[in-house]
Regions:
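Long, positively charged amphipathic alpha-helical accessory segments at protein N-termini or as interdomain linkers
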Residues: 3-35, 49, 146-147, 155-173, ...
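N-terminal lobe of the biotin/lipoate ligase/transferase fold
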Residues: 6-158, 166, 241
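Residue-level signal for inorganic ion chemistry
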Residues: 40, 93, 137, 180, ...
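Short, ordered beta-strand-loop transition motifs
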Residues: 55-58, 176, 295-296
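Short loop/turn motifs enriched for small/polar and acidic residues
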Residues: 59, 178, 184
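A short coil-to-beta-strand element that immediately follows conserved catalytic motifs
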Residues: 109, 172-176
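Glycine-rich beta-strand-to-loop/alpha-helix junction loops that act as flexible
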Residues: 114, 178, 209-213
Length: 323
């Protein structure tokens, strides 16, 4: 049961405007909510400052759908009881989640940022972010399983994100082992997960799963070096769904897959575009080339080098051709 919070005047006005078919006058809102018309006007101004688009006319106010990250909408949409924090900007939602542990915040906790400054991917590589055109989020989770029985969180998450995008957009995304999601041969999502262990008991305390999703960054806005490598779900900048919808769908799928862990590995294998392909990878500064032939039940990539087969549990692989 989710804890019911008292709505502020601002939240009540927003809910009322969203539900209304027609223009609502300041007088009507004031009477319904039992506040002054000045209070209504001030609350409307605050909502606009936050980025909500509200049309003004002689007859009153009308809500225009806009893509604002809305903690309340996300909280209500996710079937699990997850605390939601929405930030205007963050240096790293992964670091925010680590800080939340230090601050004694309860889990599961989802931190979503409208913009990520100096975002980093795996191997500490920078990636491109844009305000109100991406989704940058991390989930803090306390696993119930023992260390040996843990699901492959990165793989499970990749399936949840990929399937959510496919369903909402009617597209066919693919996964590059281990944690990147591609659309039309270009990267749209990167996923990271890390574990926090209790040093004294050597037990797992928390898992943090983070991701960056290129949502509606116009293709021409990507730097030259990323033009051939990265794209957005809506490269023309015109989104047909909201970020809130995608966030809700992703986490509902994630929690469903987590509850029934029998299906995600097969789904991941089906969506992998590296199986059967020639790949290169580095080990101890030496480059190897082989064919990716399987993904094991523990998420390792099996590569046939000809004279032997090797299992990769992490690291970067390159494909001769993504096509």
């Amino acid at each position: 049961n989710k804890g019911a919070k008292k709505l502020s005047t601002k939240e009540k006005i927003l809910a009322r405007l969203k539900a209304a078919k027609n223009v609502l006058s300041g007088e009507t809102l004031a009477q319904e909510l039992g506040v002054s018309r000045t209070a209504i006007w001030k609350a409307i101004k605050e909502l606009e400052k936050k980025g909500y688009q509200i049309q003004h006319s002689a007859n009153g106010y009308r809500y225009q759908a806009s893509d604002i990250l809305d903690a309340k909408e996300i909280h209500e949409g996710i079937h699990q009881d997850v605390d939601i924090t929405v930030l205007e900007t963050s240096t790293s939602t992964m670091k925010d989640a680590q800080q939340a542990v230090m601050d004694g915040k309860r889990s599961p906790l989802l931190i979503v940022a409208d913009m990520q400054e100096a975002p980093r991917g795996r191997f500490n590589r920078p990636f491109f972010a844009a305000k109100q055109q991406g989704i940058y989020m991390s989930l803090l989770l306390e696993p119930k399983e023992q260390l040996t029985e843990l699901p492959q969180y990165t793989i499970l998450m990749a399936v949840a994100v990929s399937e959510a995008i496919d369903e909402l957009l009617g597209v066919d995304t693919q996964i590059k082992w281990v944690n990147d999601i591609y659309l039309n041969h270009k990267k749209i999502v990167g996923i990271l997960s890390e574990a926090m262990t209790d040093i004294e008991t050597n037990s797992l305390k928390y898992i943090i799963i983070g991701m960056g999703i290129n949502f509606s960054i116009p293709q021409e806005n990507y730097p030259d070096e990323l033009q051939e490598k990265a794209t957005s779900l809506f490269p023309n900048g015109q989104a047909t769904i909201t970020r809130n919808q995608l966030i809700i769908n992703i986490w509902n799928r994630f929690f469903n897959l987590l509850a029934d862990q029998t299906t995600y590995l097969d789904a991941y294998r089906k969506k992998s575009f590296v199986l059967g392909k020639k790949i290169t990878f580095k080990r101890k500064d030496q480059s190897y080339m082989g064919t990716a032939i399987a993904i094991t039940d523990t998420g390792e990539l099996v590569v046939d080098l000809g004279e032997e087969k090797v299992h990769l549990s992490s690291g970067e692989i390159s494909l001769s051709s993504i096509q």
